[in-house]
């Protein structure tokens, strides 16, 4: 028996440096984000939006584009000025070790490409990141939607996002009072609600800017090309709660998706009138004491909406954090095996992102493009998906 134990200990000791070495190699490996599944090429631009009330947002816009020559380089995942700040924020060597070298991530977006002329105008989707994330951290979802004929707009708000780097070189990090990890209980929930309300107002401001861009874009790119009568909103985590809040607040929203976000505030009692979908991770992997209240709030919203305008989907084995590009970048089978052993995930990260992109684009196709509702109930090829109601 002692001999067996010694052998197991020796194998463990030998496995550690191998695991560390493979993880370090994975950090530097070039990673191409999942290829968009739609027929359009994808373009990307940024806008610095301001108004007299001192609201300022750094917006990223992905859109259906005219295809360019295959040899043309795609946009950086993050511009160099952003990358240096994000790398600095990561801080410790361990954090660098466990995360991706962003300079090695390849997108499918062409910088400043001409918007596609296949349609006279395109519906608009506003995308809101989670609490600590940058909107570019959801590039896989944005590119896929753009490839299906949507103009996708995401923004990073100064003081309420981990960091914003403006074109003039200003770097604005999140204000200490917006760090929810430093709070707990009722104080944390109240501050989260305040952030949701502020972000909802930001979405309204972003749509105001898009209306101006549609009427008088100096570059001519988006002039008359934005169909602002067909606006959808989705977000992840606290951004998902924001998507529902904005649809509650503003009739310009025609459909919303909450991706694994806990609803907050008055929408729990009042719900929303627009079609909505909850796209959820596998909460069976979490304690019922934590998920019970969230499920009750989702049920409250769900029960107040007609049956043909609501949907709740769970991706079995999905992890909360892998709806972002964190899932899309996780290609190492070894690291996935470790996450499964730790109980942090049961399905491949890229698989989770693929399922999410399918259901997000299909939902908006149904409610913004009048695709058949039966498309949302087509489970072919997605055995991990469970329709809750």
Spans of features found by a protein language model:
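Alpha/beta-hydrolase-fold serine-hydrolase catalytic core, especially in secreted/extracellular enzymes
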Residues: 2, 6, 27-36, 50-52, ...
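Active-site machinery of serine-nucleophile hydrolases
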Residues: 65-66, 76-97, 136-183, 312, ...
């Amino acid at each position: 028996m002692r001999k067996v134990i010694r052998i197991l200990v020796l194998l463990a000791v030998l496995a550690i440096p191998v695991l560390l070495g493979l993880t370090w190699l994975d950090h530097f490996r070039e990673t191409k984000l999942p290829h968009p599944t739609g027929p359009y090429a994808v373009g990307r631009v940024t806008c610095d939006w301001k108004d007299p009330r001192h609201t300022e947002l750094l917006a990223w816009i992905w859109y259906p584009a005219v295809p360019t020559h295959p040899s043309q380089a795609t946009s950086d995942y993050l511009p160099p000025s952003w990358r240096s700040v994000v790398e600095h924020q990561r801080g410790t060597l361990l954090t660098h070790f466990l995360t991706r070298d962003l300079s090695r991530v390849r997108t499918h977006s062409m910088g400043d490409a001409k918007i596609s002329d296949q349609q006279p105008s395109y519906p608009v989707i506003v995308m809101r990141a989670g609490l600590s994330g940058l909107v570019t951290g959801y590039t896989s979802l944005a590119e896929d939607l753009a490839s299906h004929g949507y103009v996708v707009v995401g923004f990073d708000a100064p003081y309420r996002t981990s960091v914003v780097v403006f074109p003039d070189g200003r770097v604005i990090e999140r204000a200490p009072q917006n760090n929810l990890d430093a709070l707990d209980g009722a104080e944390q929930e109240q501050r989260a609600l305040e952030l949701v309300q502020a972000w909802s107002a930001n979405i309204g401001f972003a749509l105001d800017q898009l209306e101006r861009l549609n009427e008088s874009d100096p570059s001519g790119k988006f002039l008359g090309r934005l169909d602002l009568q067909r606006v959808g909103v989705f977000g992840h985590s606290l951004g998902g709660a924001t998507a529902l809040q904005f649809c509650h607040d503003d009739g310009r929203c025609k459909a919303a998706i909450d991706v694994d976000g806990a609803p907050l505030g008055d929408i729990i009692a009042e719900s929303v009138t627009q079609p909505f979908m909850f796209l959820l991770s596998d909460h069976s992997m979490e304690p019922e004491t934590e998920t019970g209240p969230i499920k009750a709030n989702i049920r409250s919203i769900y029960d107040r909406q007609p049956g043909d305008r609501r949907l709740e989907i769970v991706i079995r084995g999905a992890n909360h954090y892998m709806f972002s590009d964190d899932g899309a970048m996780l290609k190492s089978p070894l690291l996935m095996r470790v996450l499964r052993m730790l109980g942090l995930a049961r399905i491949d990260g890229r698989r989770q992102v693929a399922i999410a992109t399918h259901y997000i684009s299909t939902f908006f196709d149904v409610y913004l493009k009048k695709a058949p509702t039966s498309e949302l109930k087509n489970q072919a090829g997605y055995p991990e998906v469970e329709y809750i109601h």
